Design a protein with these regions (language model features):
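Alpha-helical transmembrane segments and their immediate juxtamembrane cytosolic regions
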Residues: 1-347
Length: 347
């Protein structure tokens, strides 16, 4: 964040959307173990994965301001800190043999599971000067041009099997670019929705109708809901995953994110959670992996679906309560800003 804007007022709707996003992240990951055994759980999981990271990436773009000092002393530091925590967890708890996966250095530098997002943000933030130039100097035309270029890069990148876990860096980049480029228009949409009920209600109804219909279709499907490439978008194009699939994924993610700005921008109960996403995002995955490794997920596999749903909710909510607590967040806020101190705004 630029130093002069470090004291800028928060936009509540962004915290609200981040709160929704982190809920979906945690519930999505905690139900993944059961998604292939139940159409209800599988359809819910796929629905979450259509848009939850698009929403998160857009929110990151909405609050992004370029600062090389912050990029190094906070964002790079957070990534390395998170990777160190994950590395210790993998070595001590999972007793992983790093020699079989590229060695200890590769395990530390390359993102483990959910850490891809912090990894991607480092690359995305380097493009901020170009994105903000297009937005601020060329206005709406520049924003449209920037989004078109980011989509073109994402679609082209799918033709290459990228090393160093770069596939998602390219695949999800348009969502981040959209948040940066269309920040004025998205802010305007939030203000309009707060003044005119129709701007809030109509997108909500359209989202419910569209997602409800697609959910119903998945519930009627006779086979197994297991198209992993289309769900995760973490591989190059190949059999069962094409450029058209990625284009649809990008379109659905952007349109859904816009609709959620209008529909849920005033749902303030989610805002407190949205202000505490760091600890939840970093630590929920090792907690989940630990529970799976201990066998906590096995007893429910043969149970009726309502029991499985209740079990997932219990575990996910317990994780959220712990990681959303004041002591945990106080520690993580201190760690996040250990090297980065915002400069005071000069008059």
């Amino acid at each position: 964040m630029a130093d002069r804007q470090s004291a800028a007022p928060r936009r509540d709707y962004i915290d609200i959307l981040k709160g929704l996003g982190i809920l979906l992240v945690v519930f999505g990951h905690f139900m993944e173990q059961y998604r292939l055994g139940s159409h209800l759980i599988g359809a819910t999981f796929i629905t979450i994965y259509w848009f939850h990271m698009a929403l998160f990436c857009m929110c990151s773009g909405l609050v992004a301001h370029f600062s090389l000092r912050k990029l190094i002393t906070q964002q790079l530091w957070l990534y390395l800190l998170g990777q160190a925590i994950m590395l210790a967890f993998r070595a001590v708890v999972l007793q992983e043999d790093f020699a079989t996966s590229g060695g200890l250095l590769a395990a530390f530098l390359l993102p483990w599971r959910h850490m891809w997002y912090l990894y991607a943000l480092l690359f995305w933030h380097l493009t901020l000067p170009v994105l903000t130039f297009l937005r601020d100097k060329l206005r709406l035309g520049g924003a449209v041009l920037g989004l078109a270029l980011s989509v073109a890069i994402s679609l082209w990148a799918g033709t290459i099997d990228w090393p160093f876990t770069l596939v998602r860096v390219f695949a999800f980049y348009p969502f981040y670019a959209f948040g940066v480029l269309f920040r004025p228009q998205i802010d305007l949409l939030d203000r309009a929705a707060s003044r005119f009920w129709a701007v809030r209600v109509v997108p909500a109804l359209l989202l419910l109708a569209g997602y409800g219909f697609r959910f119903w279709q998945m519930m009627q499907y006779e086979g197994q809901l297991s198209e992993s490439a289309k769900i995760f978008n973490d591989v190059a194009y190949g059999e069962g995953y094409t450029m058209a699939d990625r284009a649809v994924f990008l379109l659905v993610g952007i349109v859904t994110s816009i609709g959620l700005v209008a529909a849920l921008g005033n749902c303030r109960m989610l805002a407190p959670l949205g202000k505490r996403t760091l600890a939840i995002y970093l630590l929920h995955m090792p907690i989940l992996t630990f529970l799976v490794d201990l066998g906590f997920y096995e007893p429910a596999r043969q149970m009726p679906v309502p029991v499985i749903v209740a079990w997932v909710l219990l575990e996910a909510l317990g994780c959220l309560c712990i990681l959303n607590s004041e002591p945990v967040n106080r520690v993580f806020n201190w760690l996040a800003n250990l090297w980065y101190k915002p400069r005071k705004k000069t008059s």
